[in-house]
Amino acid sequence: PYTLQTTWAAQPAVLLPWFRDHKPEVLEKTKWIMSMKDYIRFRLTGKVAGEITDASSGCLVNLDTRRYDRRIFEILGIEDCYSKMPKILESTDISGYVTKEAEKMTGLPEGTPVAAGYFDIDANALASGVLSDQELCLIAGTWSINEYLSKEAPREIEKKKNTVTL
């Protein structure tokens, strides 16, 4: 009820308990838990941060507070992971600036602002022009996703459907 979505096998809410049970040494050595996009942003800026649309898609965020929720980590038996989660930024926040080291590696000018960014599905909706609750978008790809905007998150999730609320 906190995350307002169902889980699937590649989410942190599923993967972290698996690591706890099968490869605890990996979690013991882990300093931060973040998405790939967050890691790339970290390498560009040197700043550790998460981003709300990626973070919420992992089933560890309480969407009412838009923050990681210790209760979710306790329910999943991964309490030790809670302190390894980075602060969550809004998608349009500037998370930092390209460092001198990143400039040498990428050719991006030092000091270039780096936005937190969007989860791919959210970015797709924006790129498709879904800007109000009067429009919807269909993604005919790996998942065949239908997406729309709503002022209110769905509170009743049908168990037969994979619902993601971001």
Where are these regions (language model features)?
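Glycine-rich phosphate-binding/catalytic subdomain of phosphoryl-transfer
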Residues: P1-L166
